């Protein structure tokens, strides 16, 4: 078990990119607990990761949907990678799904990569599924949730871009989302609302991640 208190400053560390994984055979050896971020293309995964670790350009952001085409691994800097000196956590930025304009063979490759990773990674502690707060859970999102349920992978919903809607609309979105999760066995019941642009909800997300890897 990792001590929660000893990790409290981890998001003040400098973080670095260590590996891009284009296919499942390039995955790094299983080591530290992994926290993955999944979501539709352009939902704001890379922006949220940057805001989470207080670095503007750690994860590459783009207005072009489908920019993230690999599993991108990030860890706190300063660890050697030796078994006795592994980083306490790795963040994984997953390829966005639901991008219809990409070539079919590319979409198929992304889909296979996502599904293979989610099914077989024992060090994966939780997937944060990012949902645009303006739109709620769409068909592609529901398909990922179904996969996570079947694979018994713990996941939690994070609403992004929450500053783009009125607070009353956001409150209703949270209620609606909670209702949709009631019959999903792998879903963590608490919904997190965030805004990368306004730094809203980030402390709650950091705390949730730390509690997850401390178990």
From Swiss-Prot:
The keyword Ribonucleoprotein does not apply. Coiled coil: none annotated. The keyword Iron does not apply. Its cofactor is Mg(2+). Pfam families: MMR_HSR1. GO terms for molecular function: GTP binding; metal ion binding. SUPFAM superfamilies: P-loop containing nucleoside triphosphate hydrolases. GO terms for cellular component: cytosol. Keywords: Cell cycle, Cell division, GTP-binding, Magnesium, Metal-binding, Nucleotide-binding, Septation. Residues 31-215 form the EngB-type G domain. Mg(2+) binds at residues 46, 68. GTP binds at residues 39-46, 66-70, 93-96, 160-163, 194-196. GO terms for biological process: division septum assembly. InterPro entries: G_ENGB_dom (IPR030393), GTP-bd (IPR006073), GTP-bd_ribosome_bio_YsxC (IPR019987), P-loop_NTPase (IPR027417). It comes from the Bacteria. HAMAP family: GTPase_EngB. Belongs to the TRAFAC class TrmE-Era-EngA-EngB-Septin-like GTPase superfamily. EngB GTPase family. PANTHER family: ENGB-TYPE G DOMAIN-CONTAINING PROTEIN, MSS1/TRME-RELATED GTP-BINDING PROTEIN. Necessary for normal cell division and for the maintenance of normal septation. This is Probable GTP-binding protein EngB. It comes from Bartonella henselae (strain ATCC 49882 / DSM 28221 / CCUG 30454 / Houston 1) (Rochalimaea henselae). The gene is engB.
């Amino acid at each position: 078990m990792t001590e929660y208190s000893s990790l409290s400053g981890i998001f003040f560390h400098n973080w670095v990119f260590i590996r891009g994984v284009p296919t499942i055979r390039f995955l790094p050896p299983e080591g530290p607990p992994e926290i993955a971020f999944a979501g539709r293309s352009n939902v704001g995964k890379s922006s949220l990761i940057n805001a989470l670790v207080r670095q503007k350009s750690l994860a590459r952001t783009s207005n072009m949907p489908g920019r993230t085409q690999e599993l991108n691994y990030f860890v706190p800097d300063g660890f050697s990678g030796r078994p006795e000196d592994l980083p306490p956590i790795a963040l994984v930025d997953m390829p966005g799904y639901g991008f219809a304009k990409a070539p079919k063979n590319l979409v198929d490759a992304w889909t296979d990569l996502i599904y293979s990773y989610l099914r077989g990674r024992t060090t994966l502690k939780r997937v944060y599924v990012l949902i645009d707060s303006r739109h709620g859970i769409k068909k592609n999102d529901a398909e990922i949730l179904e996969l996570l349920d079947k694979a018994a992978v713990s996941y939690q919903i994070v609403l992004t871009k929450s500053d783009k809607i009125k607070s009353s609309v956001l409150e209703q979105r949270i209620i609606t989302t909670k209702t949709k999760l009631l019959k999903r066995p792998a879903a963590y019941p608490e919904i997190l609302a965030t805004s990368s642009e306004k730094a809203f909800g980030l402390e709650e997300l950091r705390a949730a991640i730390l509690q997850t890897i401390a178990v």
